[in-house]
UniProtKB/Swiss-Prot annotation:
Keywords tagged on the record: Membrane, Transmembrane, Transmembrane helix
Name of the featured protein: UPF0252 protein PF0978
Database matches in Gene3D superfamilies: 3.10.620.30
Taxonomic path: Archaea, Methanobacteriati, Methanobacteriota, Thermococci, Thermococcales
Family, as annotated: Belongs to the UPF0252 family.
Predominant cellular place of this UniProt entry's protein: membrane
Pfam family for this entry, one: DUF553
Length: 328
């Protein structure tokens, strides 16, 4: 029997977009309508009442019950609604209001927009990072956020990555990070305050890396089973893992593969990962159709190298209908 394979991809984008230059930023810059310097753009644009107004409705629509959900929602929205502009004709940084109209930009445009959304919602412990690479003088910028004591990179797409995951994924894409310039950004009485830089070497990135273990993988499996049982009429049937149990028929199986999960996962965003996985299982059209008549399920979580493998089984309970004989 052919087992359908569902693949849930999280893409990591680290395209460089900043030419090297000598910093000329002060806390009281002369603001222009368009800025090339990222520090000046963040301060000037995000102090502008016009930009705050442009961001307000979107930020409110993306606000979740906590910071983790808000960050997840922002990155998901950016991934689905914006695209990277490989042919941007100028190095002027887009104002958030412009970016929201054009729907395409480069890393600095994403950085300002993401920060603007977070600051409009009054989140603290947010900022940005300038990333240096070994093989190129072109730099990269990304928004960052400190969540529960861990620094996460918010780079245009899901998922948010801790520093260790970020440097590993960047290296896998052929871009070797040598250092990062870390800046924290806050807002006080309408004024943007930028603090930094703090210089992070490659070893600083690597030290801040979460390593998933078997206990956490088991907790993910248990949580997914519980969520499926609560959101459907299905009962958990352990025997479906191996065969079609007595009293059941039509055993079906699906495999959901999440590439690089062992590298990108961090338990601070566990709830968001779980909800995303459940959505891709329960909202798959083929699975939804079979759930209508199924009565039992089983789910198993394993790994293959760095990938997460979720095996999902469904079966229908056989109802025996006997025959009554009339005796005269």
């Amino acid at each position: 029997m052919r087992v359908p394979l569902l693949i849930l991809l999280f893409l990591v984008l680290t395209s460089g977009c900043i030419a090297p230059s000598t910093p000329s930023f002060t806390q009281t810059p002369t603001c222009l309508e368009q800025e090339k310097d990222l520090n000046k753009a963040i301060k000037c644009y995000l102090e502008d009442p016009r930009e705050i107004k442009a961001l307000t409705n979107l930020s409110k629509s993306l606000k979740g019950p906590n910071e983790e959900w808000t960050i997840w929602n922002i990155l998901k929205w950016e991934e689905e609604n914006l695209k990277y502009d490989d042919n941007k004709p100028t190095n002027y940084i887009l104002r958030p209001s412009e970016f929201l109209v054009k729907r395409k930009g480069v890393c600095t445009d994403y950085t300002v927009l993401t920060l603007g959304l977070l600051l409009t919602l009054n989140y603290s412990q947010v900022g940005f990072m300038i990333v240096h690479y070994a093989e190129s003088t072109t730099l990269h910028s990304t928004a960052i956020a400190n969540v529960s004591g861990t620094l996460f990179v918010l780079d245009q797409k899901l998922p948010p990555l801790d520093l260790g995951s970020y440097i590993v994924e960047s290296g896998k894409a052929g871009k070797l990070i040598t250092q990062g310039e870390l800046y924290y950004v806050s807002k006080s009485n309408g004024s943007i305050i930028i603090e930094g830089p703090t210089i992070l070497g490659a070893n600083d990135f690597i030290r801040q890396d979460y390593k998933i273990d078997e206990q956490e993988l088991k907790s993910i499996e248990i949580a997914l089973k519980t969520m499926i049982a609560q959101r459907s009429k299905l009962s958990q049937v352990y025997e479906l893992k191996y065969s079609l149990p007595r009293g059941f028929k039509e055993r079906r199986a699906w495999i959901l593969k999440i590439p690089r999960f062992r590298v990108i996962y961090n338990p601070i965003f566990k709830e968001q990962y779980l909800e995303t996985i459940i959505y891709h299982i329960l909202e798959d059209e083929e699975i939804k159709e079979h759930i209508k008549t199924a009565t039992g399920f089983y789910l198993e979580v394993t790994t293959e190298q760095e990938d997460l493998i979720i095996k999902f089984y469904l079966a229908k309970q056989y109802i025996y209908k006997g025959h009554n004989k009339n005796r005269g």
